[in-house]
Amino acid sequence: AVVGETGAGKTTLIRLLLALSHPTEGRVTIASAKHPERRDVMTHLHRCNFVYVPQGNTLMSGTIRENLLLGKPEATEEQITEALHQSCADFVMSLPDGLDTMCSEQGGGLSEGQAQRIAIARALLRDRPVMLFDEATAALDPETERQLLQNIMQTKQKTIIFITHRMAVCDYCQNVLHIKGEGEGQ
């Protein structure tokens, strides 16, 4: 997990990890699981190894199914159902139109927490080795957050990074990086 106050540099770190920005000093490198001794400088070419769930709602206008298939166009019904379950979005199957429920731009018609869980399901379908969640549980109640974190942390052979203000998220992480802003005694 990466924690820090607003303005401490969490967003900058995300931008560096995704090679959307370049460091003014030093360099960002990535090592392969197969060849940990080999380190490559991060470039936009590494971005395909990441799945990123940003803070807030990122759903598109269309059906829930269409939004999920953006993560994996060839996903089967079984894979979609599993991703919804893993992201605590089982509620989708109880909606009158289920996966064919329409949502407007920014997930209109759904609560913020529901839209966030669908975005997480889409990320799980994308199936990349590094999963980056930026305040992805902020709109969830504590019980749903707990279950979601347990489900995500059962994912095997992935690097999972949570950017968060919520210390409860840190309880599920092997390592916690505290970023201190200016004037905080870096």
Question: PLM features: what roles do these ranges have?
Answer:
Residues 12, 51, 56, 64-67, ...:
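ABC-family ATPase nucleotide-binding domain "signature/switch" substructure
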Residues 25, 98, 135:
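Conserved N-terminal beta-sheet scaffold of ABC transporter nucleotide-binding domains
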Residues 41, 95, 101-103:
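Helix-loop segment at the mouth of the active site in Rossmann-fold oxidoreductases
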Residues 1, 5, 15-82, 147, ...:
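Conserved post-Walker A segment of ABC ATPase nucleotide-binding domains
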Residues 8:
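ATP-binding Walker
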